[in-house]
């Protein structure tokens, strides 16, 4: 069956601020800020869908059990993403030294709605038949040094510590419950 409003309606807004400052011949700094807001859905007409796939109860319709329906659903994504980056740089004839850090935070909601059904069971318009949230934090600090021993030989070192945290909870579009709470820390040396 043709449905004339099967759409993918998603948009993002991006906001950025960049700042670079040179203090003298040796010192400089940078800061970058970013915010992205994304939201939208795709809409579909589905025929003969099982009530159980949407967490709905069967209906008794004039003595006949009805447990399927034609419906229109929307599957949503609504998220926010924040990033901060900062560095400080010292440079002279023999050494190039950079210190910095980065932090990002993602918060995403994923959910589904039935916006119309031939047989609605106990469902109301805009009820969520699945609903999940995901959070991710990523923090990193680093330092890099390049030391010139002479015109042909340099020493290089890079140290990074990174922490990533994932937290998710809710249920999937298949109505499977999930919960994740993981934290990872890494130390990444390079020479």
Model-derived features: where do they sit?
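Face-selective signature of the C-terminal outer-membrane beta-barrel domain
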Residues: 9-173, 180-186
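A conserved mid-domain beta-alpha-beta active-site/ligand-binding segment of alpha/beta enzyme cores
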Residues: 2-8
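Short, intrinsically disordered, charge-balanced linker/junction segments flanking boundaries
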Residues: 189-191
């Amino acid at each position: 069956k043709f449905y004339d409003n099967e759409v993918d309606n998603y948009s993002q807004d991006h906001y950025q601020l960049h700042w670079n400052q040179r203090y003298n011949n040796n010192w400089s700094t940078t800061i970058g800020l970013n915010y992205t807001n994304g939201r939208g859905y795709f809409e579909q007409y589905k025929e003969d869908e099982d009530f159980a796939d949407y967490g709905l109860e069967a209906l008794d319709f004039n003595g006949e059990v009805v447990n399927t329906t034609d419906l229109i659903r929307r599957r949503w994504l609504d998220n926010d993403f924040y990033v901060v980056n900062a560095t400080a740089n010292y440079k002279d004839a023999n050494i190039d030294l950079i210190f910095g850090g980065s932090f990002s935070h993602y918060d995403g909601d994923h959910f589904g709605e039935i916006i119309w059904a031939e047989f609605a069971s106990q469902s109301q318009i805009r009820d969520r038949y699945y609903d999940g949230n995901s959070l991710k934090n990523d923090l990193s600090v680093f330092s890099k040094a390049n030391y010139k021993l002479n015109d042909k030989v340099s020493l290089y070192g890079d140290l990074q510590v990174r922490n990533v945290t994932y937290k998710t909870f809710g249920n999937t579009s298949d109505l499977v419950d999930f919960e994740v709470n993981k934290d990872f820390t890494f130390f990444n040396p390079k020479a």
